[in-house]
Amino acid sequence: MKVTYYGHACFSVQVADKTLLFDPFITGNELAKAIDVKTVAADYIFISHGHADHVADAATIAKRTGATIVSNYEVTVWFNQQGLPKTHALNHGGGWRFDFGHVKFVNAVHSSSLPDGTYGGNPGGFVIESAEGNFYYSGDTALTMDMKLIGESTRLTFAALCIGDNFTMGIDDAIKAAEFVRCHEILGLHYNTFPPIRIDPPSSDREIQSRTSALTPVAAR
């Protein structure tokens, strides 16, 4: 698997000759201004919930690439209404086998509404299993005991966890989440994009490295 980080909560994973893109928010992210969204590849776009900083570039990328949008029912219906019929709806606890592997939609503790105020259903995360490895994307969430179920059922290669605090887990809770899912290869997400989620990267890195192994993704260009 090849992991590419685009900033905020957006990253992609190449697995089984497919590119899985998560929560695309690039054009509105000042920290990602060097990235040309027209070059971002996707065969599938996974949306954890409806907030603008997770869906902003999804429609643009889906129209250009023909990618399938995977999310909860309410979010996929919203994209259908935006003229994007190529979607796959999941709901909590449900899974589906795609051409690259199996995806399960799991619980997240957060809120969700679409940019126009439409109800976004319940937020979630994704557990993806493939022949090349397994990983968990938490989406925006608080620390939750449900994460222990992931560790009991799936041997993870890495976990992508929010660490920015204020709106989601902070560093300490993310480290506890890593313990819950029994994975210590961690990709930290959802930090430094806005003032409320600013953290001190050097001290945060030291804290994470002292208790887990931080995953170093390929830098997006």
Regions found by a protein language model. Give the residues of each.
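Pre-active-site segment of Zn-dependent metallo-hydrolases
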Residues: S12-H51, A56-K63, S111-G117, T141-S153
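Active-site neighborhood of phospho(di)ester-bond hydrolases with catalytic His/Asp-centered motifs
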Residues: L21-D23, A42-G50, V70-Y73, Y136-T141, ...
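Active-site HxH/HxHxD metal-binding segment of metal-dependent hydrolases
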Residues: K33-S112
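Active-site-proximal loop/helix segments of hydrolase catalytic cores
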Residues: L114-E179
